[in-house]
Amino acid sequence: MATMAHANTSHPLYVAGMAGNTNHMSPWGEDAHKRWLAALGPSSLRGPFAWQTCPQQRHPHQPDVSGPPGSGFGEQPSQDTPNPMFGATGPHQQHNFPSHPYAAHNSKEAHEAWLKVYQSVWGNTKHAGAWSGPWSPAAGGRQHHMSGGGGGGGPRWMGGPMPWTQCDETKKSFTPDIDVVETPESYSVQASLPGAKKEDVKVSWDPSTYELRIEGVVSRSVGNDEEGEKKTEQSGRFSLRERQTGKFCRTVYLGSQVDGDKIEEGGLSAGMDDGVLRIAVPRQGSGKGVKEITIV
C-alpha cells in the first residue's frame, strides 16, 4: 500500500486511506463521492465534481492510491476525464486551478456538507478531518500548503486543531502566520503580527463551529494603511517595500475538545507582546478516558 500524501483533507478519498488498508478503503470510492454530492446539493462552487482516481501523471501533492479492481482506487482513468481533485479537463491538465472542494478556496460549505455525510455513515465526525483551504489565494495557494499552513500545520490533524483561512481577496489583504501549541490544559494560538496595535486587532470565538477568528489591520505609519502610504510617499519614495500591511484575518478550527464552559466563564484570554498575539483557549481535561461499564 502506497503512503498517503497530505491526508489531512476531508474528502472521502483521503479519509478512506487513513486506516492504511484496502479493505477499509473499498467502501469509500465512488459511493462516498455520490453521498457527498447529494449532501452538497445546489451550490455556487465551480465544477465539475466528477469522481475519478489518480491518473498516472498525477500532481505532486496528489496521493499514490492503490486498491483492488472495483474498489474505486488504483483504476487509471483516461486523462481526458475530469479529475475532481485538481479540475483536470484534458490531457496533462492536473495543474489547472482546483475545482474540487478539496482544494477550492470557497468551499467551506462543501466541507460542512461532507461532515453531514461522514456523520450519517460513522455516527460521529471524530476523524472526519478539518477544512484548511490551503489553495485560498489569500492563503498563498499551494506554497502556503507546502509550508505548513494547511498540510499538518495544526496538532493532531485527525480530529484535532487544523487552521482554515479566508481573507478578503484584495491586494492589501494578507494572512498572518500562526502556531498552535497544545497542552493538557489549553490550546495556545500564537499569531505573528509585527507592527499591529492591539486596539486594531479583534479576536472572537464561535462556539457553534469551534472556530477562533483573528482579524484587524496593520498600518504602515500614520492613519490607516492607505492614508499612511500616501503620506509617506509625499515625503519620499519607497526603494523597498516588503512589510505585510493592510487588512488581515485568520480563522483557526480547534475542534470539540475546547472547554466551552470555561470560555463562557471568561477563560479565554489574549495578549500582544513584541509583535506576537497570544491567545489561550481552555480545553477539556485529558483525564477523561474510556470508562468501562458493568453489565448487570
Curated annotation (Swiss-Prot):
Coiled coil: none annotated. PROSITE patterns: SHSP (PS01031). Keywords: Stress response. The keyword ATP-binding does not apply. Residues 169-296 form the sHSP domain. It holds the Pfam family HSP20. InterPro entries: A-crystallin/Hsp20_dom, HSP20-like_chaperone, Small_HSP. Residues 50-83 are annotated as: Disordered. Monooxygenase; part of the ergochrome gene cluster responsible for the typical purple-black color of the ergot sclerotia. The ergochrome gene cluster produces several ergot pigments including the yellow ergochrome secalonic acid and its derivatives, as well as the red anthraquinones endocrocin and clavorubin. The pathway begins with the synthesis of atrochrysone thioester by the polyketide synthase (PKS) CPUR_05437. The atrochrysone carboxyl ACP thioesterase CPUR_05436 then breaks the thioester bond and releases the atrochrysone carboxylic acid from CPUR_05437. PANTHER family: HEAT-SHOCK PROTEIN 20 FAMILY MEMBER. Belongs to the small heat shock protein (HSP20) family. This is SHSP domain-containing protein CPUR_05420. The lineage of its organism: Eukaryota, Fungi, Dikarya, Ascomycota, Pezizomycotina.
